[in-house]
Amino acid sequence: MAKAPARKASPAPAASNRERPNEPQRYKASKEELLEFYKQMLLIRRFEEKAGQLYGLGFIGGFCHLYIGQEAVAVGLQSALDGEKDSVITGYRDHGHMLAYGIDPKIIMAELTGRAAGISRGKGGSMHMFSTEKKFYGGHGIVGAQVSLGAGLAFAHKYNEDGGVAMSYFGDGAANQGQVYEAFNMAELWKLPIIFVIENNQYAMGTSVNRASSEDQLYKRGESFRIPGIQVDGMDVLACRGAAEEALEWVRSGKGPIILEMKTYRYRGHSMSDPAKYRSREEVQSVREKSDPIEAVKRELETLGLKEDDLKPIEAEIRKIVNEAADYAEQTPEPDPAELYTDVLVETY
């Protein structure tokens, strides 16, 4: 009986032809930088707590999505941006990103309460805030819509040769939307200067990420488009800043888009109307005790010689800013009824 031919050894896999970014290093912040991170994160936390109170009192209508627990992401990433040329766009959980980009808390709170002094003149509410002056392009209520718009912002940066980068935030739920992948494809084809930021807070409304995503390592989502991804501890502001530095170096050097998956956690429900019965109080408390981003910065500051008593004046200052923003929002007038007929048609191009 003839012998079967010997099986040939499988050839070694071809070397990857895809360049990869360096592994980001945790940012080495000075005492002054750490204090600024602490102030910004505390401002977001206290602002959102006040917004939740105003919602409960009926001053805020419609939907309201709070950023409590995720503060390190917006502060760490946006502290690395150039506010003169870089643009930011996000979804409906947008208050924290606006505060991290230096927008006045008073006009944000006024928008939340539907006042004419709000950043969108009281028409946008919680989910639809916008400021071309500050290069903040929303605030979008349609899940995933901001990702393709972010690719458009990046195209504008490249077309105008202004050196700017677009940072487009979206969540783990939006990561399953079809238009996200269309945006990935075009961004890589045209080597657009965009950082896709997936804020993986573990739950898309009430559905955990591993129940909704066959690939729950979301930083890998761009591999078939040749877009590199990095997974980041989104509860550590210094890790976030370090990842931003690496991503910006990649994008500004003309290598095209990059994905940052920020592993974070929201303490409140999806929105103010969500009782969050899909997870236990013990789960939330465990994350607070082990991974709270603000407490982590306080520990860093302690190693630099700052004690709890040194931080109390900052807490008092932040509470004063937030209370003044709430008072302003409650006292300023609502939009004139004639505003119903403005911003309906495009009047200038």
Outline where the language-model segments fall.
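Short gly/pro/ser/thr-enriched loop/turn and capping motifs at secondary-structure boundaries
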Residues: 96, 202-205, 266-268
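Cofactor-binding active-site loop characterized by glycine-rich and histidine/acidic residues
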Residues: 49, 57-190, 208-214, 219, ...
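N-terminal amphipathic, basic-rich helices that act as targeting or association modules
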Residues: 2-93, 101-103, 349
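A short, conserved beta-to-alpha structural element at the edge of catalytic cores
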Residues: 190-210
